[in-house]
UniProtKB/Swiss-Prot annotation:
The UniProt record lists the keyword Transcription regulation: no
Biological function: A chromatin protein, binds double-stranded DNA without sequence specificity. Constrains negative DNA supercoils.
InterPro entries found in the cross-reference section: Cren7_sf (IPR038647), dsDNA-bd_Cren7 (IPR020906)
A GO term from the CC aspect: chromosome
Post-translational modification: Methylated at multiple sites, to varying extents.
Family per similarity comment: Belongs to the Cren7 family.
Official protein name in the record: Chromatin protein Cren7
Gene (name only): creN7
Gene3D superfamilies (UniProt xref): Chromatin protein Cren7
Keywords, sorted A to Z: Chromosome, Cytoplasm, DNA-binding, Methylation
A molecular function (GO) term: double-stranded DNA binding
Localisation: Chromosome; Cytoplasm
Quaternary organization: Monomer.
Length: 59
């Protein structure tokens, strides 16, 4: 599952522009008692790094 997430391109909106990027890193964030989400880091063409939730996990 991890390889599928990292090899897929996601739409990232930043500064009014939209990019189709592959994540450089992804992890699961799951607070106690709540459903989890997959968070990913994306490197923009201008060198900035942004974080975005890309998937919700079932409870």
């Amino acid at each position: 599952m991890a390889e599928e997430i990292l090899n897929r391109e996601y739409e990232v909106e930043y500064g009014g522009k939209r990019y189709w990027l592959r994540p450089s890193k992804a992890w699961v964030l799951q607070p106690p008692g709540k459903p989890g989400v997959v968070i990913a880091l994306f490197k923009l063409p201008d060198g900035r790094t942004v974080r975005k939730a890309i998937m919700r996990l079932p409870p």
